Amino acid sequence: MAVAAACRGPRIVRTHGDFHPFNILFDEQDELALLDASRGCKGAAADDLTALAINYVFFALPRRATWRTAFAPLWKAFWESYRLARGAEELERDLGMAPPFMAWRALVVANPAWYPDVTLETRDAMLTLAERALDADGLDLDEVEELFA
């Protein structure tokens, strides 16, 4: 399995642990601040990457037309920016480790205890994403498109 092989790699990073848009702030000078890093520790970059990236999918699902015009370009730009910053090899390694983290994040946002106003259709799509992630050897960035087909 790609996840097991990737875990043997040399790259362990400091993680935030709850990296999502509502924990990222910018001030008037565009300085970045991260909130709520209490669950941060050392781990896989794939954890924080999927925690942030899943929001492009999650916020597009209730208004599916926004995927093609807004969120898909942002999704692609996010991953491309990471590739440019870290290199293709690290991106591939992190995508190989991403499935369990993506599945976990999908389960979190599908959970009515944390997101009670999410529609059944959105919950179902997030659960589908979780199942597909767990069935995969790595995160296929293009597979997300199927949720909007």
Q: Where in this protein do the model-derived segments appear?
A:
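Active-site activation/catalytic loop segments of kinase-like enzymes and analogous catalytic loops
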Residues: A46-G87, M102-T119
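Surface-exposed alpha-helical segments enriched in charged/polar residues
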Residues: A2, K76, E80, T128-E131, ...
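Catalytic activation segment of kinase domains across protein kinase-like and atypical kinase folds
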Residues: F22-F58
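Regulatory N- and C-terminal appendages and interdomain linkers associated
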Residues: N111-A149
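Hydrophobic HxD+1 residue recognition
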Residues: F19
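Acidic, serine/threonine- and proline-rich low-complexity regulatory regions
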Residues: S38, R63, A85-M97
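A cross-family kinase active-site recognition segment
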Residues: R11-I12, R39-K42, D124
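An alpha-helical support segment within catalytic cores of ATP-dependent transferases
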Residues: M1-H16
